[in-house]
């Protein structure tokens, strides 16, 4: 073990630090110098009130910077004053290809050096390279098949249709009409038990796809002729990830090899300090920006869902303005804020998510009313297929599906929800993370598949650094995500703590704050939410299913009560105490109003719980525009007090309610 024990030199002093929750208290901070050895990882687990900041320092002998990354997101070298902050009980690991020296401000309750090489440099990289080859093949199909381009261009995706169900193999006519296997990038599903590291693997694969040296466009690039003309002249590249020439048509295979091996460029510290130059990126046209445009599909509506628990989302990524997903806080499971908030603009320190798609499940367990869960999946798959018909960059880059954790009860249904999602999203690769039985069962299931589209099953070991989390932590994360939606993020450290700590460590340090040290976690600003009182009848609030119904004896003679797991019921809090109690302290999803119900029975009574202005199925597939929190009710005045992220008119007066409760304390 002596060869991997790192020399950590630290100094400790008392400063006033604002914790990640913004309470402000005296904490004991330390400034440590850590040498991170090649292919190993330094594990950090923060507890409540703890925050750390990390930056590169040059080698004292050579003066060169090393390389390091967190779940595939690089810490940019060559900028000593750039700090990366982490808080909100984050659990993460720093790893390095060739070794690096980093400075750590603050201390965690748990931090240690792993005694085995990071999986980043074994199966994770091999998996990425296989996906890279699949993306290049998809791009070549789109580039060389004019008939495919013509088919996609002629497809009409403007018309809104009702997607069919994927209950059986080959079902789902609407989605199948839009789906074409040609030109499709890899569609990868990550499955495994809870706390196995599924989201971490998703972030790693997404980061390496975003940092790829490939050009994700059908044409060769607007700069192709210019670069070819001046190929013999010295040229300054914006980073190692674009150092190859993607526009040489003389030898496609050589170009593929260059792109596949481009990941090796990430390992060289001398190249890392040129990585992702903002000035160079600004000069490049859109078609010449390197990196794939993958889409993360978050199908776990529990803690860590996007943007809040109770949602499932498709998050299209772009390698701009930077090409990585950070991990500053578990409240931002993929390091980004989606535009569904209606208040948080894309951060300049992360990639952008272009027109994300979020749908409301209203629950944190997909097994609860699974028929409803599957129908929401139908709608999400339908929206994704429509997107991929016209967004060819995302099409060739593929899908990365983050699935709910597998539990013992799933085996009794032969992992029915997994099979359903495989059909709906046309999955071609299932990565089983750390679950031997699940790997064997899925292998047996798809060995007998006669559809001709059975996915490939890939088993990978669970990382030794995967952290088991308990129900208390999950509830904290649940509350933190909802709170950060309305209130944003505080800085991990106060300005006073930042200046004091730097000054106490170095007499020559000016009384200014180095870049990133006082940055809000995830670059999400602190918000001032708006509490307002609105008429009770301003919002049309619906829920799926009905907990309590009138007995049959209370119905008209001859009438029967027909209930469905997917029946949408309009709330009536004035006349129903159950609806009133359900509404108080709930988080409501404001959704895009679907087309009006033209086929409803004109003779039906407005008092009928099933009577409303929209088709049930249309409401299940309505896109989320934002959220409000019901903080108080006044039934005498028929008023609701709601909390909104910003003042002004609500984006919609059509709302869906689930079992998502939160108290603003």
Swiss-Prot record:
CC per GO annotation: mRNA cleavage factor complex
UniProt protein name: mRNA cleavage and polyadenylation factor CLP1
Positions bound to ATP: 91, 195-200
Biased composition (Basic and acidic residues): 219-238, 598-614
Organism phylogeny: Eukaryota, Fungi, Dikarya, Basidiomycota, Ustilaginomycotina
InterPro entries referenced in this protein's UniProt entry, alphabetically: Clp1 (IPR028606), Clp1/Grc3 (IPR045116), Clp1_C (IPR010655), Clp1_C_sf (IPR038238), Clp1_N (IPR032324), Clp1_N_sf (IPR038239), CLP1_P (IPR032319), P-loop_NTPase (IPR027417)
Subcellular location: Nucleus
Pfam families assigned: Clp1, CLP1_N, CLP1_P
Keywords: ATP-binding, mRNA processing, Nucleotide-binding, Nucleus
């Amino acid at each position: 073990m002596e060869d991997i024990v790192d020399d950590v030199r630290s100094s400790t002093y008392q400063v006033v630090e604002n914790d990640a929750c913004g309470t402000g208290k005296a904490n004991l901070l330390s400034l440590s110098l850590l040498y991170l050895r090649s292919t190993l990882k330094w594990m950090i687990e923060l507890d409540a009130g703890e925050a750390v900041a990390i930056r590169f320092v040059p080698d004292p002998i050579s003066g060169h910077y090393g390389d390091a990354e967190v779940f595939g997101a690089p810490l940019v070298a060559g900028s000593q004053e750039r700090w990366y902050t982490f808080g909100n009980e984050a659990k993460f690991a720093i790893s390095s290809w060739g070794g690096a020296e980093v400075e750590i401000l603050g201390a965690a309750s748990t931090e240690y050096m792993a005694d085995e090489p990071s999986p980043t440099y074994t199966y994770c990289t091999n998996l990425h390279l296989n996906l890279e080859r699949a993306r290049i093949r998809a791009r070549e199909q789109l580039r060389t098949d004019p008939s495919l381009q013509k088919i996609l261009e002629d497809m009409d995706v403007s018309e809104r249709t009702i997607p069919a169900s994927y209950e059986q193999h080959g079902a789902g006519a609407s989605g199948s009409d839009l789906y074409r296997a040609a030109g499709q990038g890899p569609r990868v599903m990550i499955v495994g038990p809870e706390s196995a590291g599924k989201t971490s693997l998703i972030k790693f694969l997404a980061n390496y796809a975003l940092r790829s040296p490939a050009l994700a466009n059908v044409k060769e690039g607007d700069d192709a002729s210019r670069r070819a003309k001046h190929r013999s002249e010295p040229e300054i590249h914006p980073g190692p990830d674009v150092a190859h020439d993607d526009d040489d048509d003389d030898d496609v295979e050589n170009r593929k090899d260059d792109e596949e091996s481009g990941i090796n460029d990430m390992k060289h510290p001398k190249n890392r300090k040129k990585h992702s130059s903002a000035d160079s990126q600004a000069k490049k046209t859109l078609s010449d920006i390197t990196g794939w445009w993958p889409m993360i599909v978050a199908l776990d509506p529990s803690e860590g869902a996007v943007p809040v628990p109770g949602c499932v989302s498709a998050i299209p990524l772009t390698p701009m303005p930077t090409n990585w997903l950070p991990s500053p806080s578990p409240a931002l499971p993929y390091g980004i804020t989606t535009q569904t908030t209606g208040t948080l603009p894309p951060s300049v320190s992360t990639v952008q998510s272009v027109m994300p798609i979020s749908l409301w499940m209203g629950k944190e367990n997909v097994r609860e009313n699974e028929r409803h869960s599957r129908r929401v999946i139908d709608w999400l798959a339908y929206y994704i297929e429509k997107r991929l018909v016209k967004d060819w960059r995302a099409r060739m880059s593929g899908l990365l599906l983050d699935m709910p954790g597998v539990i013992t009860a799933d085996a009794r249904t032969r992992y029915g929800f997994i099979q359903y999602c495989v059909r709906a999203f046309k999955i071609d690769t299932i990565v089983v993370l750390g679950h031997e039985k699940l790997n064997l069962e899925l292998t047996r299931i798809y060995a007998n598949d006669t559809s001709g589209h059975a996915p490939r099953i890939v088993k990978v070991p669970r990382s030794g650094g995967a952290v088991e989390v308990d129900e208390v932590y999950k509830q904290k994360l649940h509350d933190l995500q909802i709170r950060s939606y309305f209130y944003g993020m505080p800085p991990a450290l106060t300005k006073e703590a930042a200046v004091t700590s730097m000054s106490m460590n170095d007499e020559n340090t000016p009384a200014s704050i180095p870049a990133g040290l006082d940055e809000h976690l995830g670059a999400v600003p602190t918000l001032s939410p708006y509490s307002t009182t609105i008429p009770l009848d301003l919002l049309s609030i619906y829920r799926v299913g009905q907990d309590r119904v009138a007995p049959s004896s209370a119905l008209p003679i001859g009438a029967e009560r027909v209930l469905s797991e997917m029946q949408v019921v309009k709330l009536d809090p004035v006349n129903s105490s159950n609806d009133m109690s359900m509404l108080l302290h709930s988080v409501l999803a404001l959704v895009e109003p679907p087309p009006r119900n033209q086929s409803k029975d004109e003779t039906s009574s407005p008092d009928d719980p099933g009577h409303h202005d929209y088709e049930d199925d249309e409401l299940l597939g309505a896109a989320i525009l934002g959220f409000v929190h019901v903080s108080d009710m006044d039934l005498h005045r028929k008023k609701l007090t709601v909390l909104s992220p910003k003042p002004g008119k609500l984006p919609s007066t059509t709302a869906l309610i689930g079992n998502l409760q939160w108290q603003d304390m």
